[in-house]
Amino acid sequence: MYTQGSAFKRQNLTRHLVPLIEVAKHGYVIAIVEYRPTPTGIFPAQIKDLKTATRYMLNHAFEYSVDPYRYACFGDSSGAYASVMACVTGNMQEFSDEDVRFSPLHYRACVDFYGPIDFSRMQEFPTNWDHESEKSPTGLLFGGVNIRTVPDLLEKSSALNYIDSKKLPPFLIMHGKKDRMVPFSQSVMLYEKLRQTDHRADFYALENCDHGSDAFFTPYSLTIVLDFLSNNLKKGN
């Protein structure tokens, strides 16, 4: 399940179609998920939409020739945030539109390319973006407010608050050390929290790479993704 980055606005669903086709050539069925954009798509709409799309694919597994027991999330930027949150919130009802008692989800792996993790700390580190005003991507995600006025949403939206001893899928994290939009420290925090709670995570720091760099979709980078997916989606895992 692939979710495209867009600062939570309307997504260009074909932006990474070429590298995704390369991944599909290795036997993967890829569904590109369009989540509700801001300003109408208010948190946690994006997470709910990803889970709804996943359930749709599982309910049509025969039609799309997919294995309903082996599926993963993959996203970049805001799409990576949705992917990570879908995995760490698991079957919490408040993050699903469907009844989780009858349609539980169990993602087997998560690929996170330079996604935000904790919105309350985005402005602490070097960035050339406004992450806090009512017109910022996060402000619009929260309904058009300054994020400092809604501490409850900041807490609820932080992926770090859902990472504990419960079972989680393995994570592959890739982030550019020169990212000027989503601070590199966001992925560092995610990786450290996963490791502190004894979860599996691989972290690749890309030197001199900015947000959304083509370096993330080179054959070398895609080989890392393919190896990760192969290791974690193979039968018997």
Predicted regions, residues:
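Alpha/beta-hydrolase superfamily serine-hydrolase fold, recognizing
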Residues: 1-237
